[in-house]
Curated annotation (Swiss-Prot):
PANTHER family in the cross-refs: RIBOSOME MATURATION FACTOR RIMP (PTHR33867:SF1)
Keyword hit for Cytoplasm: yes
One GO cellular component, as annotated: cytosol
Entry keyword Cytoplasm: yes
Disulphide bridges, residue numbers: none
A biological process term (GO) from this entry: ribosomal small subunit assembly
Protein name stated in the entry: Ribosome maturation factor RimP
Natural source organism: Enterococcus faecalis (strain ATCC 700802 / V583)
Lineage: Bacteria, Bacillati, Bacillota, Bacilli, Lactobacillales
Functional summary from the UniProt entry: Required for maturation of 30S ribosomal subunits.
Length: 157
């Protein structure tokens, strides 16, 4: 985790706790020539634009008040909901995703694939099982949790 992400996580957490919001993820990424500091937040029933703006304003105030500046380069601050394809980070995220369609990225390929989508049917501390449609048939596939690089909710087409 970068120092910018750690700093922002520490700064935004009390703001979110005060409002009963949840921190989903903080990322600091360069896209083209620009840097983006993205803070994804949520709450029971979903987050709205006014709530995102409130958090953005409070976080900006805290960042601007720090000396020295914790993020010396210019960047764009974005505070938003995680959207329909919410990342699965915490154990509770995975538990809430049982029965839902998800996308996983693997460190090592399984059956020649590193990107797999399916319905999460089972979960324990070591593995998760997806119901995956391969051509015309449905197959259950089990994956070691330690082989999962990233996971998120997905939209099924």
């Amino acid at each position: 985790m970068s120092s910018a992400v750690e700093t922002v996580t520490k700064l935004v957490t009390p703001i979110l706790e005060e409002q009963n919001f949840e921190l989903v993820e903080v990322e600091f990424v360069k896209e083209g020539k620009n840097w983006f500091l993205r803070v994804f937040i949520d709450k029971e029933g979903g987050i709205d634009i006014e709530e995102c703006a409130f958090v953005s304003e409070k976080l900006s105030e805290k960042l601007d008040a720090m000396d020295p500046d914790p993020i010396p380069q210019a960047y764009f601050l974005e505070v938003s909901s995680p959207g329909a394809e919410r990342p699965l980070k915490k154990e509770s995220d995975y538990e809430q995703a049982v029965g839902k369609y998800i996308h996983i990225s693997l460190y090592q390929a399984v059956d020649g694939e590193k990107q797999i989508e399916g319905t999460l049917v089972h979960l324990d501390s070591e593995q998760l099982t997806l119901s995956v449609k391969i051509k015309t048939r449905v197959k259950e596939m089990t994956f070691e949790r330690k082989n999962i690089a990233k996971a998120r909710l997905a939209i099924q087409f």
